[in-house]
Amino acid sequence: MAYISGKTMLENAYKEGYGVGAFSAHNAETIQGILEAAEQMKSPIMIQVGQKVIQNVGLEPMKALIDIYMKDVTVPVAVHLDHCRDLGQAMKAIQLGFQSVMFDGSALSFEENAEKTKLVADAASHLGIGSEGEIGKIGGTEDDITVDEKDAQITSEEEALAFADRSRVDYLALSIGTAHGIYKQEPELAFDRIEEISKSLNKPLVMHGGSDVPDADVKKAIGLGIAKINVDTELRVAFTEGMKQCLQDNPNEYHLAHSLGAGKEAMIDKVKEKIRVFGSENKARTY
């Protein structure tokens, strides 16, 4: 299976009532882990490339690395640019062959957010690439941007509809009670708001801050219209704990292939766990 447009992938998930995991990659081992888990579970997935990784590795090198490991992959995969705040970077990702791009203008005024997001959505649409925008303020820390939880704002139905109409994005990220990073307390999701917006908008919705949200809450949100669930923190924790355990068991282990391999295996287990929760296992055959 070749790469597939994020738009096609999420519209299929939305129609069929399951969620697609958008898993953040950071290096070769995390790319391998995400793809191996998807293959084992026969699941469509998104690989996300975030801003911190772009700062450390570079946009083009990350896409090239993913391309290398995609050669023998048989499940549908979309590479997604996450939380882009620079129009030039978004256009570069489109040129590099990303299948999905997000412009995050949530820190801007409504008008500027909609205007800039539409520029990205229009460019992506011409090439059949999926586009994502964000309306509302999602709490927590994502790369170099922090939104205090007290400043987080639940997205209203009115602003979601107006933003979707103005920006023309294919799928929309909402502020629904989740947060980026590690939760200080269990999140309270605005299920009624998800349902209202989904019924009015009739297009895939996106959950950011999907790590550590209770499984039952995630499943309920998917049933109400969430089609893309972003997962990063839980994967990084699993990978790091896998490495730590390897080094604790073997204090004199200096072969990075061993410790990184242990991290990858732990991450594979976590990705497979999430795929089961999202309901995308064996959904690759529907493409």
UniProtKB/Swiss-Prot annotation:
Q: How is the cofactor bound?
A: Binds 1 zinc ion per subunit.
The protein's Enzyme Commission number: 4.1.2.57
Q: List the disulfide bonds.
A: none
GO biological process terms on file: carbohydrate metabolic process
Required co-factor(s) are: Zn(2+)
Residues at which dihydroxyacetone phosphate binds:
181, 209-211, 230-233
What catalytic activity is recorded?
6-deoxy-6-sulfo-D-fructose 1-phosphate = (2S)-3-sulfolactaldehyde + dihydroxyacetone phosphate
Q: Which PROSITE patterns match?
A: ALDOLASE_CLASS_II_1
Note the InterPro entries from the entry.
Aldolase_TIM, Class_II_FBP_aldolase, FBA_II
Annotated Zn(2+) binding lies at 83, 180, 208
Q: What GO molecular function terms would the record report?
A: aldehyde-lyase activity; zinc ion binding
What family does this belong to?
Answer: Belongs to the class II fructose-bisphosphate aldolase family.
Protein name (Swiss-Prot/TrEMBL): Sulfofructosephosphate aldolase
The gene for this chain is sqiA
